Amino acid sequence: MRFLWFGKKKNKTVTEPRREPVEVFSVDNFVLVTHPLGNAAGTALSSEVICSCIFSVIVHEESVASKAVQDFLQERGAMPLASSEYTHSSSQGYAARVKHQDRDKSSTVLIGPPAVISKASVPFHPEISAAIAASQEIFIVAIDGITYAAFTISSEMQ
């Protein structure tokens, strides 16, 4: 015996596979000082040069967080510069020699926690000191022993 059904057929529902949450990184509290020592000769750098120096050091790191920093800096005009002698330590931070387009020599670029960078640089500019006071999980950028920038990296699950 056969069963005949003349009613409506059920629509097949397609369920999408559940998406796993992804950790998304972003740069926050970015402080950039182009004249950290006031009118002292030879210490002023353009924001593009500062961002390019940071980018040229961070580009050696292959993590999702560093990719977020690279994207952030490229939005601000950063371009890759020639770099050498790259080093990274989880406790000390990043370091490399970077050759600017507007200088004949290369500069030492340090990126790391305030306690480490303060030992290798002149006293921090007040804007950078204020950023440090606002967040202890901050990266400080020093170029040839002068602090030019500070930033934090935050993450959220999406």
Predicted regions and their residues:
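Generic N-terminal initiation segments characterized by hydrophobic and/or small/turn-forming residues
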Residues: M1-F3, N29, T34, S154
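Polybasic, Ser/Thr-rich amphipathic helices
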Residues: M1-N11
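Cytosolic catalytic regions of ATP/NTP-dependent phosphoryl-transfer enzymes
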Residues: T13-V122, Q136-T147
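Divalent-cation
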Residues: E127
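Short, acidic loop-to-helix structural element flanking the phosphoryl-transfer center
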Residues: F151-Q158
